[in-house]
């Protein structure tokens, strides 16, 4: 399914009408005028919601940033254009792509990681990029307790997004008002105790979820070292 979705996406790279609102499993197009909590989880006509979430996880921005066939300026232009197009189709808190905190987290992590691959850092953020990161973190915060209650990979994903995003925003006079980093570090310490057993195994009996959690923790550590943020 992922191969099919990727193929369909890149074939429609320049066809932006409802690109990020389309369920690529069945072609269903979601409305973007409903708050995320009004989107029906069990609408049979919509099908599996992961079909619309897939593109909005933004793994493809990393692919753009790493594409050796594109110039640096072309990559920046593509990233800017696709970010603007995504926001046009997905106004803040409206539509299916704001529904899940983990999906929101993966999107902003991939966005920031793509900037890293392009040789950019927090000091290079423009106003639209700052706002893009901020609204994602602000969506995660109110439902973080829900992710914590699940005691699974969702919790780690949202912690990682808050930490990494908070690090990138800290010199833009935003995270002083909302202590994203402090919240993330506190939650990370708790999650490490709750989600990992003494033998190193994970709370979920899945190597994939264990790998996912360890990857995110590694990214948190790397980001803390690069930007000089103490997480001990």
Listing of model-derived features with the role each one plays in the protein:
Residues 1-19, 23:
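Extreme N-terminal leader/anchor segments
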Residues 4, 15, 26, 34-36, ...:
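Low-complexity, compositionally biased segments
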Residues 32-34, 39-42, 46-232:
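Aromatic-lined, polymer-binding surfaces characteristic
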Residues 16-28, 33, 44-45:
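Terminal targeting/low-complexity segments that flank the catalytic cores of oxidoreductases
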């Amino acid at each position: 399914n992922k191969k099919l979705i990727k193929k369909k996406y890149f074939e429609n790279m320049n066809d932006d009408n409802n690109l990020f609102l389309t369920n690529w499993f069945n072609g269903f197009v979601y409305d973007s005028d409903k708050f995320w909590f009004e989107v029906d989880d069990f609408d049979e006509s919509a099908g599996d919601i992961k079909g619309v979430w897939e593109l909005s996880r933004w793994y493809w921005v990393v692919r753009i940033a790493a594409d050796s066939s594109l110039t640096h300026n072309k990559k920046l232009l593509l990233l800017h254009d696709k970010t603007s197009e995504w926001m046009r189709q997905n106004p803040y808190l409206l539509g299916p792509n704001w529904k899940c905190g983990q999906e929101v987290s993966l999107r902003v992590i991939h966005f920031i990681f793509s900037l890293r691959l392009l040789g950019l850092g927090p000091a290079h953020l423009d106003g639209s990029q700052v706002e893009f990161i901020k609204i994602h973190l602000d969506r995660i915060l109110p439902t973080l307790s829900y992710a914590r209650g699940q005691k699974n990979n969702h919790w780690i994903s949202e912690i990682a997004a808050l930490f990494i995003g908070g690090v990138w925003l800290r010199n833009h006079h935003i995270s002083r008002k909302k202590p994203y980093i402090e919240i993330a570090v506190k939650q990370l310490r708790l999650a490490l105790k709750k989600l990992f057993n003494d033998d190193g195994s994970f709370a979920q009996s899945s190597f994939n979820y264990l790998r996912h959690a360890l990857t995110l923790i590694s990214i948190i550590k790397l980001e803390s070292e690069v930007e000089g943020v103490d997480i001990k």
